[in-house]
Design a protein with these regions (language model features):
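Short alpha-helix in the alpha/beta-hydrolase fold that links the catalytic acid
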Residues: 128, 142-151
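Conserved acidic catalytic loop of the alpha/beta-hydrolase fold
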Residues: 2-15
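A short glycine-rich, Lys/Arg-flanked "PGG" loop and its adjoining helix->strand segment in the class I
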Residues: 408-420
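Catalytic active-site module of serine/aspartate enzymes centered on a nucleophile-bearing elbow/loop
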Residues: 161-212
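Conserved SAM-binding loop of SAM-dependent methyltransferases across substrates and taxa
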Residues: 326-339
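Short beta-strand/loop motif that positions the catalytic acidic residue
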Residues: 126, 132-134
Length: 493
């Protein structure tokens, strides 16, 4: 939002913005670009602090353990001004500045490590023009993660410069003119040409996420340690599934089914005995399901925001959710929204439709809400929805299907149904820490086959939405970087 404000205040489009960031700021910008896929012109990252040097052995696991036992505490930074720059004036300024604190909250440091590892490992999702400047004598951060990050970038325009003798404060070094010259040259190249748009047309066939999906679909090497571990987990789940309500439901309907999702939303451990409830609690507290519940919160926030926006513009608020599951999150978000005149929930599953109709009746919403069976990938069905929706919701659907052609068909149908000025709310899954585990252990709603997912980068998902005729205007993401919820406006073609 700050970059959007800065662009607006400068009276330029977002596509004219180049962001320059150093150290921890560079990590923040790399994370922002990865998670939100802003349509800026490019970025310059200077000595990104992807891995801070901790000179005490086992410092990081020790801090993590102590944080778990003790809670929040602060540690004093070892960094002195003389480790940052050769510029004596800046060293003195650093040492005497009362606004610079040596105390660092342990959760901030640990989160910096976790986020950096995620962004470096998945840097292939970043396709913007990028320049990376690395200080040659950096006593504060490690160099190898910076190089790994750069090598994984997929921008057709990227360049790396190593500055010999430079300390960590690259842009505050004594010979910083060298760094600024390289930045000026790179930025001039960006503005000398049209803003580059990465081509995502074949991402589902030739991109790195497609390669990973195919590898996961093939399964691990037979009788390898990983394969044996997954076999053990599957047997354990069958054993515990008799006692854990969540595991039993997942194995019966698919862990990606609407019924499983609704159970996760409720977040109430259930089982045939105390042991079963204990197992169920562990299951519900997995990072993926915590992310799902945060996604529900973000969905409801943006649904309410969209309703308020449409109402303020004097437009009728007619809602459709094309793959609603049981519809709990939509109905809970809209039950107290009098501006909404019509709610249509759809799903492919007869079970979900029946459960959803019960929820509508329980909430006393039968006068303006209905639930019907329908195909979310049939553009002919979607384009003829009546009445024409002004707010369409697609949650948790596209993430389950690796091919983009189905997604394009669905979005094309919605684009025909929604009039200009209408709103689309859609979800994404740009990254997941448990892809391998899920593919090896859990089953899907597709006839009990392994639940293998292809992650779509946020930039890829936004590209599909934009090509269909929508302009993204806002987004939310959970603290783990797994699930996104975005809002886009139907543009007038």
């Amino acid at each position: 939002e700050f970059v959007r404000f800065a662009a607006s205040d400068s009276q330029v489009g977002l596509e004219e913005v180049v962001v320059i960031a150093q150290s921890v700021g560079a990590v923040m910008v790399a994370t922002w670009v990865h998670d939100y896929a802003p349509a800026i012109r490019g970025l310059v990252l200077v000595s990104p602090a992807f891995k801070v040097k901790l000179y005490v052995p086992l410092a990081r696991p020790g801090l993590a353990l102590w944080h778990r036992l003790r809670g929040l505490f602060f540690i004093n930074s070892y960094v002195k001004g003389r480790y940052l720059t050769h510029d004596r004036q800046r060293v003195a300024s650093f040492n005497n500045d009362p606004l610079i604190t040596r105390a660092i909250a342990v959760n901030i440091l640990l989160d910096l490590y976790k986020t950096s590892e995620r962004i470096v490992s998945d840097a292939a999702a970043i396709t913007l023009p990028t320049q990376l400047l690395i200080s040659g004598d950096d006593y504060v951060v490690h160099r190898q993660p910076q190089i790994d990050f750069y090598q994984r970038l997929r921008s057709p325009l990227k360049e790396l410069h190593l500055l010999p003798g430079f300390y960590h404060d690259t842009l505050g070094e004594e010979k910083r003119a060298q760094a600024f010259e390289k930045m000026q040259s790179f930025i001039s190249r960006l503005y000398a040409n049209k803003s580059q748009k990465f081509d995502y047309q074949h991402e589902d066939r030739t991109g790195p996420s497609a390669d990973r999906w195919r590898l996961l679909s093939g399964g691990p090497v037979p009788l390898s340690p990983v394969d044996l571990a997954y076999r053990f987990m599957r047997k354990a789940m069958k054993l515990f599934g008799a006692h854990s309500a969540g595991l039993h439901l997942g194995m019966s309907t698919g862990f990606d089914s609407g019924s499983s999702l609704d159970y996760v939303y409720q977040n109430q451990p259930q089982g045939s005995n105390a042991f079963g409830r204990f197992i169920d609690k562990i299951y519900l507290n997995s990072v993926g399901w915590r992310g799902i519940r945060q996604r529900k919160t973000h969905l409801q926030m943006l649904i309410k925001q969209a309703v308020a926006h449409l109402h303020a513009k004097g437009l009728a608020v007619r809602v459709v959710d094309i793959a609603a599951g049981h519809g709990r999150y939509v109905l809970d978000a809209l039950v107290n929204e009098p501006a909404v005149s019509d709610i249509l929930l759809r799903d492919y599953s007869e079970v979900n439709v029946a459960q959803g109709q019960e929820m509508i009746a329980q909430r006393g919403m039968s006068g303006r809400a209905r639930f019907e069976q329908g195909d979310a990938f049939n553009p002919a069905e979607l384009s003829t929805l009546t009445p024409r929706p002004t707010l369409a919701i697609v949650s948790g659907l596209y993430e389950l299907f690796p091919e983009n052609e189905q997604v394009k068909n669905s979005l094309a149908g919605l684009a025909k149904a929604i009039e200009p000025g209408g709103i689309l709310i859609y979800t994404g899954q740009p990254w997941h820490p448990q892809l391998e585990l899920i593919a090896g252990v859990l089953t899907s709603h597709k006839d009990g086959k392994p639940w293998v997912m292809r992650v779509r980068s946020q930039a890829e998902m936004d590209s599909l939405v934009h090509d269909a005729g929508f302009d993204k205007c806002t987004q939310r993401i959970d603290e783990w970087g797994i699930f996104t919820v975005s809002m886009a406006v139907r543009r007038d073609n």
